[in-house]
């Protein structure tokens, strides 16, 4: 990408939900399609020494999505009223505020920490368990953070790009955060395994349904879905770690490390 929108890149609201992570990061490129130019020959050094392994893993993840998650998402989208879908998305996004708050604190961002705690408290109570995003209407902005961003803020480079089975796009630096975020999500604390699995499944399908309208645009940006999603992921992570304050040299430096 040669240019970025000032308000950043799309973030996965159903964070780390298996193959959905790949898809949401890919949609970062879709979000940029109205305000940026995609180039597969950009100046960015896309640190991908493990591509011979990454591509087959990506292909399996994508095939799994096309065979299972996409059809489920289409059915969900067709039979579920939009207000209910919004409520489901808000509910799961609210659960991620715990992860956001902890990492805002570790990054030395007291105001962002207070905002995340405030959002969690307000939406969990006035927002009926997070179904209604009351906090945003009160000016408390959602600021997604994770351990990978925290490690990056502390100065660690991204390391090589890696595609994990079902977990999708990652870097060596982001893998610990991907795993930790799962355990910081209250869904992981549920003792009833059947109910927990149902909730995780609903989260994944709801997250996937949010991409249906954008998916066709991806094929118009590039015929190489792997490269498209990789580029989107690497730039999105660099953008998030810098809180949007970076230029092309900063981006190249972070990705190349």
PLM regions: where:
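A structured, mid-to-C-terminal "fold-capping" secondary-structure block
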Residues: 37, 41-42, 154-257
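Bacterial N-terminal signal peptides that target proteins for export
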Residues: 12-24
